[in-house]
């Protein structure tokens, strides 16, 4: 996978197959080889890049078998792009053992020219016993290992029922395959057990090779797409577009509606303006099914396109939070999802403002990171003062009062922010000021959070309007040092005798200069971009391997001249790197080559083999162009 854009575990990425590239996230419509009434041009016009069909059905039908072997799968299906084949696992699960072995069905898929070939895995039911599920996980892995991959894309399904540790084990083992479907989930999807799916997807994703495409088998209803993508799913397959059409049902992004229950078709529907619902109900069955299938396909790809746009905008989390209120099962899934800490994968900041709805918004991974820092910030046992909204709110403050408190005390200073307390000096940093808030704070949560902070430092009180006389420190210097502490995870002062240059129009900090050299500039999101001088300073302060990406000498020579770092040249790295944060590019001897922004988290660095890992903004020899 080559990553293009990302938000936490969600990504827009692409990978190559023998019949072309696939950009994810996307959906593969299921094509019945016996009955394919949508031609390739129609499928392409709706956004279809790849399709999936069942090799078991083809193999056991003499006519289809002979045709596929003689002319190839793409001729049989009449689709020139990538085609994935399933192995018959679900048929085996529903109807009992099938007549072909794992190796036979895989060899058949190879022979007919499938682009993505699926092994015959062993299906695990949601109500399966732990021991039974574990034995099926091991058996599925054994089946993967008996296959000769050659140069093919082999899909190794992740099984394990609803047991998190088995899903983790299976994902780790099956990462030997180049493509990772998450299997055994159709019964959960059909019964709206989305909270169980959240558990399955998260545990499968974080234990897998991040360079592998992750596919949710059978996850073809658009109402759950955004949740699955947020948790790291790249692809879906959908028979629902035709299955629901045959049953006179229509797919929408928030659920399903019966044809006889709707008054009119939405304007985006390909049926709009051609039929009324009542007219279509009386249409001949085959034509009605085709029209409803086109509506359903359109609904699926509208949702996929919306999700991709949300990833690009960095608003997918907001979208999931919005969609959670569209169905009780989705809300339960969202409440399950926020229990998982994905802050390791979360970028330093987002393109779009932070949306605060209510206390559930505080489970956003970026807020969890700030809350963790707040606890560390006050752990020095200093007197801690909380400044109320009377004196400080995002973007609005009593300048004289705040400056007096800051410069004439050495206290830890916190402000009230959406029901929690955070360091005052992060006031301009994302998302403290880059915020759209409902103002619906939870007083009980605020009280509980204060108790938690007092368990760390009991010397906490609220500011009551006192005036302080003796100047002890500089406001701006304290601010940039606190930002550096948070951004670089350091416990000592990064700046000391600095000359701080501010914007004449806004008064915001722009450059930090020492000895006539720019050490850092303040980004629009309130965080620091380091110059090469600043990078040398960070290198001296952070013990190995902190915030480092180690590259070979060949890459290092290019990086020193301002060129980006590519994944394939990385030799080692700090797993604590945050996407979008400053990253030091060094040699194996810890000599600095460059500084830039990490494209992915440190946890992901190991897995990707193509694309840009660090976008360099300055090398030791030259700035980036």
UniProtKB/Swiss-Prot annotation:
One of its GO terms (molecular function) is zinc ion binding. Its EC number is 2.4.2.48. The gene is tgtA. Residues 546-621 form the PUA domain. Keywords: Glycosyltransferase, Metal-binding, Transferase, tRNA processing, Zinc. Substrate binds at residues 121, 184. It is an enzyme of class 2 (transferase). Exchanges the guanine residue with 7-cyano-7-deazaguanine (preQ0) at position 15 in the dihydrouridine loop (D-loop) of archaeal tRNAs. It catalyses: guanosine(15) in tRNA + 7-cyano-7-deazaguanine = 7-cyano-7-carbaguanosine(15) in tRNA + guanine. This is tRNA-guanine(15) transglycosylase. Binds 1 zinc ion per subunit. Belongs to the archaeosine tRNA-ribosyltransferase family. The active site is at 86 (nucleophile). Disulfide bonds: none annotated. Pathway: tRNA modification; archaeosine-tRNA biosynthesis. It holds the Pfam family PUA. GO terms for cellular component: cytoplasm. One of its GO terms (biological process) is tRNA wobble guanine modification. Its cofactor is Zn(2+).
């Amino acid at each position: 996978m080559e990553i293009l854009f990302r938000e936490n575990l969600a990504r827009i990425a692409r990978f190559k197959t023998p019949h072309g590239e696939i950009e994810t996230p996307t959906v593969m419509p299921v094509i019945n080889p016996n009955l394919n009434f949508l031609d390739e041009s129609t499928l392409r016009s709706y956004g279809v890049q790849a399709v999936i069909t069942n090799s078991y059905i083809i193999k056991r039908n003499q006519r289809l078998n002979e045709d596929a072997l003689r002319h190839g799968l793409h001729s049989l299906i009449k689709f020139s792009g990538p085609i994935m084949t399933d192995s018959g696992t679900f048929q085996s699960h529903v109807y009992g053992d099938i007549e072909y072995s794992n190796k036979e069905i895989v060899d058949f898929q190879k022979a007919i020219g499938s682009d993505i070939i699926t092994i015959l895995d062993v299906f695990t039911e949601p109500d399966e016993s732990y021991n039974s599920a574990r034995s099926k996980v091991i058996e599925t892995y054994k089946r993967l290992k008996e296959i000769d991959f050659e140069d093919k894309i082999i899909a190794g399904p992740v099984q394990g029922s609803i047991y998190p540790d088995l899903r983790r084990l299976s994902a780790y083992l099956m990462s030997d395959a180049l493509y990772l479907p998450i299997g055994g989930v159709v019964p959960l999807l059909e019964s709206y057990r989305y909270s169980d799916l959240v558990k399955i997807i998260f545990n499968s994703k974080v234990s897998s090779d991040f360079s592998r495409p992750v596919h949710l088998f059978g996850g073809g209803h658009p109402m759950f797409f955004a949740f699955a993508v947020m948790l790291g799913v790249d692809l879906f397959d959908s028979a629902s577009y035709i299955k629901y059409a045959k049953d006179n049902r229509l797919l929408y992004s928030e659920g399903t509606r019966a044809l006889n229950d709707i008054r009119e078709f939405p304007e985006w529907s390909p049926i709009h303006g051609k039929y009324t619902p009542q007219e279509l109900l009386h249409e001949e069955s085959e034509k009605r099914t085709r029209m409803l299938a086109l509506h359903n396909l359109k609904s699926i790809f509208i949702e996929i396109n919306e999700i991709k746009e949300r990833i690009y905008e960095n608003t997918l989390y907001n979208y999931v939070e919005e969609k959670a209120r569209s169905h009780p099962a989705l809300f339960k899934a969202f409440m399950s999802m926020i229990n998982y800490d994905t802050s390791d994968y979360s970028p330093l900041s987002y393109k779009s403002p932070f949306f605060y709805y209510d206390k559930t918004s505080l489970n956003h991974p970026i807020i969890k990171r700030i809350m963790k820092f707040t606890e560390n910030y006050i752990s020095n046992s200093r007197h801690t003062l909380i400044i109320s909204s009377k004196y400080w709110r995002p973007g609005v403050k009593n300048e004289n009062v705040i400056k007096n408190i800051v410069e004439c005390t050495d206290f830890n200073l916190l402000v009230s922010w959406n029901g929690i307390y955070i360091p005052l000096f992060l006031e301009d940093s994302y998302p403290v000021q880059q915020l759209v808030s409902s103002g619906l704070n939870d007083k009980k949560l605020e009280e509980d959070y204060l108790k938690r902070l007092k368990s760390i430092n009991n010397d906490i009180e609220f500011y009551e309007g006192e005036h302080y006389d003796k100047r002890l420190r500089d406001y701006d210097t304290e601010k940039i040092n606190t930002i550096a502490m948070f951004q670089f995870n350091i416990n000592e002062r990064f700046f000391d005798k600095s000359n701080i240059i501010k914007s004449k129009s806004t008064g915001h900090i722009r450059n930090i200069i020492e000895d006539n050299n720019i050490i850092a500039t303040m980004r629009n999101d309130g965080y620091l971009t380091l110059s090469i001088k600043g990078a040398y300073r960070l290198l001296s302060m952070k013990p190995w391997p902190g915030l480092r990406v180690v590259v070979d000498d060949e890459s290092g020579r290019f990086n020193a001249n301002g060129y980006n770092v590519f994944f394939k040249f990385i030799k080692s790295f700090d797993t604590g790197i945050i996407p979008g944060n400053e990253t030091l590019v060094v040699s194996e001897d810890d000599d600095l080559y460059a500084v830039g922004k990490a494209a992915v988290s440190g946890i992901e660095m190991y897995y990707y083999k193509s694309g840009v890992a660090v976008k360099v903004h300055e090398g030791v020899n030259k700035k980036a162009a």
